[in-house]
């Protein structure tokens, strides 16, 4: 019997391993008695931690399913499980009444659930690598993958599925799902902080702030769950339609007050963007007006930047037709028109306090379509509102204007039919009021003054350019061309060269009339919506609305110049 004892000691020494704490930290386990597995090591004694040693099996080959089940049940130690269960309780004991959802996101086990989950957990897993653990009672746990990022790792680096607590359902969340993880457990039921992290769909050719007011219909109405925005496919891919509506309130339902607040913030951002664009545009317009009024623009210098050293620095970096005075004039007019269209899309910006919009989204779409169709088909005399503060400019006559007038009449008839059908649809759709809250935000005085400065500068620029063209046409025969460097134009694939002087001037007058008509249409619309406020009084100083036949000084002068130019052209002289 005495000879068998050394063999037993040798067998135990071969099977002995480091304690659980040293093995988890990958440190050398130092024991006072080398052949004793019950004596605590020096590191555990210094840390005042109970030293637990669990024998590890020889991992020569993977165990079968039946062998693995028997092996797991035979190695279950209730005392070790109780000791390991005390560690997470001590870790979270100082957290107080922390939100349970934060414990879910960080992976820490909820101490309120340890009473039943710690007894089921095996802190030291002895399964072979590459095999998932089988749960004896799967009803207490969620069927998540074994390598979930929220799982707590064992001492050997393998995840413990028992430590994964309840995870929030992200399938019905919007955006990145931050608010869905905290809102159900929030004491106040609010997720205002996470509302600012929702993604926004940006388009390259349009401002991102405009998407909430243009073509995107509202995803939900009041009382509709946010989960209806989710659409699944048979292939397992999740398709989310991008939406810029306000974030949902408590339990995923829409809150009208929050939606109104976010829309007001977006409107203020749009106005700030328009102010910045108008400031940049007015600086360029004032430089162009100063150059034209200085008398230095003569002959070809109207269309070329040669011999204009002071103007070269301003024009440095520009390409194409914008290097010419006429090119810059048309470009500035188009920029002013784009800014006015941007404000027109956001109709709530132009409402003074006390005004409410009674139409639904269908009526808004019909109105927008009618406006765009009418704008694209209107030229010259068919403009509904007066250009330059009065009646439309005189229509073109002659061979060129005959076809233009015919096409304009066709466009006018089609516009009339479209407006008739649109009016019937509009009357049927305006019967029900909109459920979205009306936003009253008046157009401020700063933006109105910027619009007036830009509009008067554009009129002065057109007046200076057309005055030079009028004087040159009257002083030169109809066959000669005083515009040798006029940029070539493309009209339906036909290139208009420098030899066709009259045709170039006709096209320039027609394009200018069309742009100015649209600019003044939108200024009149802004003035109508600002009735009784300071912006309306400021616009009345430029837009003469008392008598349409009486234009302002600038408008009357520009119309007279255009008539003189047309009288001297060859097609109109005949």
From Swiss-Prot:
GO terms for cellular component: nucleus. It comes from the Eukaryota. Keywords: DNA-binding, Metal-binding, Nucleus, Transcription, Transcription regulation, Zinc. It is found in: Nucleus. Coiled coil: none annotated. InterPro entries: Zn2-C6_fun-type_DNA-bd_sf, Zn2Cys6_DnaBD. Its main location: nucleus. Residues 111-133, 242-262, 376-404 are annotated as: Disordered. Residues 19-51 bind DNA. One of its GO terms (molecular function) is DNA-binding transcription factor activity, RNA polymerase II-specific. The keyword Transcription regulation applies. The keyword Zinc applies. Transcription factor that positively regulates the expression of the gene cluster that mediates the biosynthesis of oxaleimides, cytotoxic compounds containing an unusual disubstituted succinimide moiety. This is C6 finger transcription factor poxB. The gene is poxB.
């Amino acid at each position: 019997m005495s000879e068998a004892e050394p063999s037993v000691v040798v067998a135990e020494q071969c099977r002995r391993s480091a304690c659980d704490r040293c093995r988890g930290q990958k440190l050398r386990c130092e024991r006072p008695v080398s052949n004793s597995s019950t004596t605590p090591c020096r590191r555990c004694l210094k840390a005042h931690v109970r030293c637990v040693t669990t024998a590890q099996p020889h991992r020569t080959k993977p165990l079968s399913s039946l062998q693995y089940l028997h092996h797991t049940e035979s190695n279950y130690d209730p005392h070790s499980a109780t000791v390991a269960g005390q560690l997470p309780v001590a870790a979270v004991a100082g957290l107080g009444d922390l939100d349970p959802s934060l414990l879910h996101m960080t992976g820490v086990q909820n101490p309120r659930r340890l009473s039943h989950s710690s007894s089921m957990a095996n802190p030291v897993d002895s399964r072979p690598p590459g095999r998932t653990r089988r749960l004896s009672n799967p009803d207490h746990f969620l069927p998540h993958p074994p390598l979930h990022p929220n799982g707590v790792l064992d001492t050997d680096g393998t995840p413990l599925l028992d430590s994964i607590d309840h995870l929030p359902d992200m399938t019905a969340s919007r955006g990145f799902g931050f608010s869905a993880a905290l809102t159900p457990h929030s004491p106040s039921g609010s997720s205002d902080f996470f509302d600012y992290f929702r993604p926004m769909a940006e388009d390259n050719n349009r401002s991102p702030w405009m998407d909430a007011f243009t073509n995107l219909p509202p995803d939900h109405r009041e009382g509709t769950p946010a989960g209806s925005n989710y659409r699944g496919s048979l292939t397992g891919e999740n398709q989310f339609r991008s939406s810029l509506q306000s974030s949902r309130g408590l339990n995923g339902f829409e809150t009208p007050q929050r939606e109104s607040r976010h829309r007001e913030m977006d409107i203020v951002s749009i106005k700030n963007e328009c102010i910045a664009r108008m400031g940049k545009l007015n600086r360029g317009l004032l430089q162009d007006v100063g150059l034209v009024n200085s008398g230095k623009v003569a002959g070809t210098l109207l269309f070329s930047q040669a011999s204009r050293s002071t103007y070269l620095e301003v024009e440095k970096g520009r390409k194409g037709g914008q290097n010419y005075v006429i090119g810059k004039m048309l470009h500035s007019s188009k920029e002013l028109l784009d800014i006015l269209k941007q404000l027109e899309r956001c109709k709530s910006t132009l409402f003074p306090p006390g005004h409410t919009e009674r139409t639904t989204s269908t009526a808004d779409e019909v109105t927008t379509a009618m406006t765009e169709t009418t704008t694209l088909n209107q030229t010259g005399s068919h403009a509904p509102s007066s250009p330059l503060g009065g009646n439309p400019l005189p229509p073109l006559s002659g061979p060129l204007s005959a076809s233009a007038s015919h096409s304009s009449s066709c466009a006018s008839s089609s516009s009339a039919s479209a407006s008739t059908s649109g009016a019937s649809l509009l009357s049927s759709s305006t019967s029900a009021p909109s459920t979205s809250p009306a936003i009253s935000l008046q157009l401020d005085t700063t933006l109105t003054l910027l619009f007036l400065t830009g509009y008067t500068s554009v009129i002065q620029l057109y007046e200076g350019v057309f005055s030079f063209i009028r004087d040159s046409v009257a002083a030169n025969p109809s066959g000669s061309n005083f515009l040798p460097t006029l940029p070539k134009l493309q009209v339906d694939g036909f290139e208009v060269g420098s030899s066709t002087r009259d045709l170039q001037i006709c096209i320039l007058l027609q394009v200018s009339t069309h742009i100015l008509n649209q600019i003044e249409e939108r200024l009149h619309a802004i003035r109508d919506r600002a009735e009784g406020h300071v912006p309306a009084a400021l616009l009345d100083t430029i837009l003469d609305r008392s008598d349409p036949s009486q234009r302002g000084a600038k408008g009357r002068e520009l119309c007279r110049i255009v008539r003189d130019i047309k009288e001297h052209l060859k097609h109109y002289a005949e």
